[in-house]
Amino acid sequence: MITLLLYLCVICNAIVLIRADSIADPWPEARHLLNTIAKSRDPMKEAAMEPNADEFVGFYVPMDYSPRNEEKNYQSIWQNEITDSQRHIYELLVQSSEQFNNSEATYTLSQIHLWSQYNFPHNMTLAHKYLEKFNDLTHFTNHSAIFDLAVMYATGGCASGNDQTVIPQDSAKALLYYQRAAQLGNLKAKQVLAYKYYSGFNVPRNFHKSLVLYRDIAEQLRKSYSRDEWDIVFPYWESYNVRISDFESGLLGKGLNSVPSSTVRKRTTRPDIGSPFIAQVNGVQMTLQIEPMGRFAFNGNDGNINGDEDDEDASERRIIRIYYAALNDYKGTYSQSRNCERAKNLLELTYKEFQPHVDNLDPLQVFYYVRCLQLLGHMYFTGEGSSKPNIHMAEEILTTSLEISRRAQGPIGRACIDLGLINQYITNNISQAISYYMKAMKTQANNGIVEFQLSKLATSFPEEKIGDPFNLMETAYLNGFIPAIYEFAVMIESGMNSKSSVENTAYLFKTFVDKNEAIMAPKLRTAFAALINDRSEVALWAYSQLAEQGYETAQVSAAYLMYQLPYEFEDPPRTTDQRKTLAISYYTRAFKQGNIDAGVVAGDIYFQMQNYSKAMALYQGAALKYSIQAIWNLGYMHEHGLGVNRDFHLAKRYYDQVSEHDHRFYLASKLSVLKLHLKSWLTWITREKVNYWKPSSPLNPNEDTQHSKTSWYKQLTKILQRMRHKEDSDKAAEDSHKHRTVVQNGANHRGDDQEEASEILGFQMEDLVTMGCILGIFLLSILMSTLAARRGWNVRFNGAQLNANGNRQQEQQQQQQAQGPPGWDFNVQIFAI
């Protein structure tokens, strides 16, 4: 009997194996179908190919987040937007992964859910599931997958979840995965570890380990460049190292930011011809309004440039618009990729059309024509826009531009730099190269490359007495030239400067690594494209990766996507506690890297959470770096006794510092000090029983629900919010502040929310009401004194007799006073409180 059962089992297993063999792995079919569709949409490249691309590209930054709503959106996309072919491909991938344990199909599924590839919806939970399975199948040998998994555990799947996170946040596990990925050669994982040791985040601070890791990455990056790229023409890449909050007046608002804007690649517009600079170039006074940049069409029959202007000033403005149109195509913008071929064609036609008539051009036209020639010569020299460089044409056009510049005092910087490189590396004329470099050293076109080349020449030809190579390289580094950062770091480490420290050397290598955006941070572009494509969760995932790598701009962008401060009378963002905590962490990390505004925002979030001790610590740190908003906030907290004992004298000192650091806030500062005097006087009169201005104070900072006393203006805010929600439907209320609009390359818009003057000046609602009352009293006093003087009343102003029309009028007023009824005597007193 037992033998019979064994035979039956063997037969059944054989049947199963035969059936399994008869069903082939569908991965080849799925891969073939995936190759027939686009992996992702590139809106920047699409804009570059359009003849009339829109220069105002907007995207939405969500304010609210709910895991339940995300799941609803995911299901809705699958039901309404996914096509039958997509469903078929997905089923093939799932079948290959589940039934055949195909590692390639499993990895493809993880990337589909992580990056919304092939137009599938984002799902962090499924991405985590397939990444875990892929690593199990490959025995943790794929460094890219291990790095993705490490970021998931470091961020808790970007802190998703409701009561419990979908992916647990485990810093220790993330650290182990980072170390494993780094051992397998993942440069990004090494960068994460180097940043952790440099900043002391989740690990003990160790500059020696940080230096070793950053130096190792820097050496590999240096080897990735060819000799021509490193020494002659360093590659130009489109940088997306930008904070998305800077498209919306920064983190704190217009006039309050301490950190310069990171948006350096917006569309260039021609300047106002009425500006002093243009008037000086042209030699006459002119007035002309800035107009949007137009496009130029190429006429293939006669090779002419067709503009879209036909007024009397078109000929003069035409060359200006041609230059800026070509410059935008050459450099690219955040919403439009580079189109060097179109820029080169436009400049070649400009050269063909204007060169025969260059003697008839006015100074303004000559100025911009020279810039066109220099850009065209530079493109011939680098080979951009064509298959290979044309050194002969580059030298000819650049020399022509210098000859025209000598006659019309035009710009010479770009031409001198390129001609210096040609003489140094092509014709080997060192003396002529040095001459060109010296002419270009003080020009705006010098980004540090001049000092970089002179430093190398000073080392190779000391007899030329160019200067100290170390000092020249340091100047090139300070100007931001990327190869100079590495060369200067090597000089420092070799002991050329005995005053340098390990921390300083690690910082230099860190700066070089972070600057190599094209290799170390290509996901910056992916994140920005995801925002334009309305995939904010994909953008958040990309920015979170880069934030872990130590990019300050990515830390701010990731935090901004997770939590934004609400406006006055606006509901706070509805999100999870995990996201809010992670946002604070990223803001704090950015603050430690020099972003003062991020520290203020982190303090504001703690302030809203009524954790006043942490808010005070962040404000104090930002105030030490001269943040106007942080100093103001410290005065406010001392005024109301939030996190510290109430101290009007110290609050006054902080308010005075605001006007000392920035005179634009003089009025706001003085009115706040006046309010302090009034409150101090009332407190003394009532023996500290006045609490009209006291904001809410928590009974227990750890409790979510608090029943503390709330100031009247906060109660009014809540009443207005309840009235709005009562009038709106549930859906309308949910969508009422679902998104905040950001417009790229144009004016800043926030939907229907307008930036109030009170926000710019830093006032609270209670401050405005109090100051209004005080101003009302003063205005009433002045009005009464004026009317009394005109009507002949007997008026004393602070004890002084008011006499506007001489002694005779005074005698008449005294007679009228003697005959008039009682009550016509006024004694106006203004007290200095």
UniProtKB/Swiss-Prot annotation:
- Sorted alphabetically, which Pfam families does this protein's record hold? Sel1 (PF08238)
Q: Give the compositionally biased regions (Low complexity).
A: 809-819
Give the transmembrane region(s).
768-788
Give the GO terms filed under biological process for this record. Answer: detection of unfolded protein; ERAD pathway; negative regulation of protein autoubiquitination; retrograde protein transport, ER to cytosol
* Xref: SMART domains: SEL1 (SM00671)
Q: What is its main location?
A: endoplasmic reticulum
The signal peptide annotation in the UniProt record is 1-20
Ranges where the record places region Disordered: 805-824
Q: Which UniProt keywords apply?
A: Endoplasmic reticulum, Glycoprotein, Membrane, Repeat, Signal, Transmembrane, Transmembrane helix
Glycosylated residues, per the record, are: 101, 123, 142, 429, 611
Nucleotide-binding as a keyword of this entry, yes or no, is: no
Membrane topology classification? Single-pass membrane protein
Q: Does the keyword Membrane apply?
A: yes
Compartment(s) where it occurs, according to its Swiss-Prot or TrEMBL record = Endoplasmic reticulum membrane
GO CC, alphabetical: endoplasmic reticulum; endoplasmic reticulum membrane; Hrd1p ubiquitin ligase complex; Hrd1p ubiquitin ligase ERAD-L complex; Hrd1p ubiquitin ligase ERAD-M complex; luminal surveillance complex
Query: Which segments carry the Sel1-like repeats?
Result: 103-139, 143-186, 187-222, 413-445, 552-595, 596-627, 628-663
| Assembly and binders | Component of the HRD1 ubiquitin ligase complex which contains the E3 ligase HRD1, its cofactors HRD3, USA1 and DER1, substrate recruiting factor YOS9 and CDC48-binding protein UBX2. Within the complex, interacts directly with HRD1 and YOS9 (via N-terminus). In ERAD-L, HRD3 and YOS9 jointly bind misfolded glycoproteins in the endoplasmic reticulum (ER) lumen.
Function according to Swiss-Prot or TrEMBL: Component of the endoplasmic reticulum quality control (ERQC) system involved in ubiquitin-dependent degradation of misfolded endoplasmic reticulum proteins. Component of the HRD1 ubiquitin ligase complex, which is part of the ERAD-L and ERAD-M pathways responsible for the rapid degradation of soluble lumenal and membrane proteins with misfolded lumenal domains (ERAD-L), or ER-membrane proteins with misfolded transmembrane domains (ERAD-M). ERAD-L substrates are ubiquitinated through HRD1 in conjunction with the E2 ubiquitin-conjugating enzymes UBC1 and UBC7-CUE1.
Q: Record's family? A: Belongs to the sel-1 family.
Name of the molecule in the record? ERAD-associated E3 ubiquitin-protein ligase component HRD3
Q: Which organism is it from?
A: Saccharomyces cerevisiae (strain ATCC 204508 / S288c) (Baker's yeast)
Underlying gene? HRD3
